[in-house]
Structures are given as C-alpha cells and as structure tokens.
Regions:
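Terminal, charged accessory segments of proteins
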Residues: 1-242, 256-274
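Short, charged/polar micro-motifs that form catalytic or ligand-binding hotspots
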Residues: 185-200, 250-254, 283-291, 346-351
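Catalytic core segments in nucleotide and nucleic-acid processing enzymes
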Residues: 1-49, 273-397
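Loop-centered beta-sheet repeat module
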Residues: 240-298
C-alpha cells in the first residue's frame, strides 16, 4: 500500500505507475496529482491511495512524515508504527467509501467521464465491485459477527475431553479393588471435523494475508488455527481458493456462514482474476474532493425536506447546510446553519465574511417570524420568546 497526496509536488520518478492518470507537469520539472481516491495497479499488485491536500501541514504529511516516504516501501531507518499504518488504511478506506457513496447518490454522474459533476473518473460502475470493496466487506463481517465466532467456538469445545463412559466400559478392563472398579484407560469423545470452524479458520487466514498489504487491525478474541500468509498467496496465484470454497460449499446452512462463504468466494474470485492479469487497473478518483465532502456533510446532517425559502433565501443567498436541532436555551427545536463558503483555504476572516454569515441567521429568523406574524397554520419553529419577545440564538458555523 502506497500513499500519495493531492496537489503535492513530486519528482516524476517518485510516482508509482498510474496508467491512464495524467499528472500535471510543473515548470520546474515536478508533477502533481489533481485527484483524491483509490487506484489499484494490477501489474505490480499495488494499492495506491491519494489523500486530500489538507493533510499536508508545513510540508509534512499529518505534520509528522515526509510525504515522499509514504509513496515508497518503508525503509529500515524510518518505518511507520503499526498504529500509523492502521490509521492510514482506515482513513484511506473512509475516503474511498465517501467517493463511492457520492457516486451512488448522484446516478446521473457518469463515473467514467472526466466531465462529470465532480470530475469523478474510474472503471467502477453502479454494479462493479473493486478488490478493495471485497476487503472492506470481509472486515465489516468480522466486526459485526464476533458473537457468531464465540458461539461456534463455545459449542465446539463444550464436552471436549469429557469421558465417554459407554465406550470406556465396553472397550477397557477395569482394575477392581474390593467391589469398586477403577478404569485406568478412559475413552473420550472422538474429535470430528468441525466444518463451521474450518470456514472460520480460512476466513481468518485470509484476513491475516490481507493485513500484510493493508496494515489494518483485526479483532480476534479466539485462537483459531490459521494458514501462513504465503500459503494463501499461493492459493490465489494458482486459483485454488475458489476451488477449495466450491468443495466445501455444501457443508453450510446457517445464514451467517452462507453469507461468509459468499463473501470469501467473491473475494477469491476477484483476487484470482487480478493475479492472472485478467482485469483492468481499478480506479475511483475525484477532482475537487471538497464537493464530495460537502455532499457527505449534507447527507449526514442536512434536512431532506425544508420549507421553501430557508436553504435558498429571498436575497439570493444559498446555505450549504441547515438542519433542525435542540435550542441552546430551551427544549424547542431551531435551525442550525453550517456554511463555510466564506472561510476558504488561504482567506482571512474579515468584516465582510462575518456580515454575510450573520445575514444567513437573520434571514432564517425573519422567515419564521413572518410565519408567526401571519398566523400560519403550518408547522414552524418559534424564534421569539412569548414573554420577552427576544430572539432565540441561532448557531451559525
């Protein structure tokens, strides 16, 4: 896994192979990438994430690392800690999912076209799934089904090593002292193949293999016996993963285990195609990631059905995000305003931008007061106190 940064100046020879992606050439001979997102190079089996430029602080990635270090294999002198590696994967996966969800929310956005709404480019269509999608699905299953793994392990070990008295009495001769028999060779329950555990061991073997490339943290509270990562890599290279899964498919009927089998089969099928170079390079990249970020924030906190005149105000102003939340002074709801268009990178916060931000709140307050004065019967938020006639403070950030 390699990490690049949007708009950071690299030397041409420092960039990994990015077929189909043209970096911007600078006058001094350097190059920079105008994208944020995910790229998988099939030829080198290398996963590449391009992170937003906002993470470059004082020419350092996260104010700690030389960005050029993160686009190379780790050196012995400057290795990343395990926590840093896990953080980089989590952040990169989050950005990838944000772009993918943006594409789903905007079906008219032609993802293979650089002329789309936010400049999204890639091979990932509506029904396409990348190798990273399969990895994230396996991690999600592990996170959400810890109780299943614990239950199967508990059932398996219940009664294990317990004496099988019927078999012991039938097959062994006791030592009799007085009238009391003593059995010196006790028979225990025969160990049978646990097919549930067989699938789970294969699942964790797969996660251990992927952990070498993506450096994520795997939650595993039980000590399942797993295969070495190089054995899993060999199975993928030889196409044995899907053959093995087809062989054991008929042994699973529990819904969760059938789901796990399907996830594993989908991953190995894709991984074997990649290993045999039968698929194109994967990419999901976006220009102007701030547009994706704004859309994500609006999806998380924005109101889907707002009265006309609140988001698009009468004086021509358009609020980025507006939503209902509890008032700061009582138990009623009021509108919270979130808008950052006057706080752009590199610009200072002056009187002009402060006035425009305040105008947003004044317009929202006036909108509700007008409804109150007209005696409108439709639901509206009360912004004037009945006793003091003072205005309810409106958060504006």
């Amino acid at each position: 896994m390699k990490i690049l940064f949007e708009e950071y100046k690299y030397k041409p020879e420092e960039l990994p192979s990015l077929e189909g992606i043209d970096p911007i050439e600078l006058k001094d001979g350097g190059v920079k990438l105008p994208y944020v997102g995910y790229y998988y190079d099939v030829a080198s089996a290398e996963t590449i994430f391009i992170l937003p430029k906002v993470f470059i602080i004082d020419s350092l990635a996260f104010n700690r690392y030389d960005p050029e270090l993160l686009c190379k294999s780790q050196s012995a002198k400057e290795p990343l800690s395990a926590d840093d590696q896990a953080f980089l994967f989590s952040l990169s996966a989050w950005l990838y999912q944000a772009i993918a969800l943006f594409n789903e929310r905007h079906p008219s956005n032609e993802i293979t076209s650089p002329r789309s709404l936010a400049g999204v480019v890639g091979h990932k269509g509506k029904d396409d799934v990348t190798l990273l999608d399969h990895v994230l699905s396996l991690l999600r299953f592990n996170r959400e089904h810890q109780s299943l793994f614990t239950y199967i392990a508990t059932i398996k070990h219940t009664g294990q090593h317990r004496i099988h008295w019927t078999k012991t009495i039938r097959t062994t001769t006791p030592l009799v002292k007085g009238k009391t028999p003593y059995y010196l060779e006790c028979r225990t329950k025969d160990k049978t193949v646990d097919y549930d555990e067989e699938l789970i061991c294969f699942f964790y073997s797969t996660l251990d293999y992927l952990k070498q490339s993506y450096h994520f943290v795997v939650q595993r509270h039980l000590n399942y016996k797993t295969e070495k990562p190089h054995r899993i890599a060999n199975m993928i290279e030889c196409g044995k993963g899907t053959r093995y899964l087809r062989k054991i498919r008929g042994k699973y009927f529990k819904d969760e285990l059938v789901q796990l089998w399907n996830l594993l089969y989908a991953f190995y099928e894709r991984a074997e195609e990649v290993a045999q170079k039968r698929v194109p390079n994967e990419r999901l990249l976006v220009r102007n990631f701030n547009i994706v970020f704004e859309d994500m924030i609006d999806c998380l906190i924005g109101e889907s059905e707002l009265p006309k005149g609140l988001k698009e105000q009468k004086d021509g102003k358009i609020i980025d995000h507006i939503y209902r939340d509890k008032s700061l002074v009582d138990d009623d709801d009021i509108y919270f305003i979130g808008d950052s268009k006057y706080y752009k990178e590199g610009s200072s916060f002056g009187e002009n931008s402060r006035y425009k931000q305040i105008t947003y709140a004044k317009n929202v307050i006036q909108y509700n007061i007008d409804l109150f004065n007209r005696g409108a019967k439709s639901e509206y938020l009360r912004y004037r106190d009945e006793l003091t006639e003072g205005y309810n403070p409106t958060p504006n950030f």
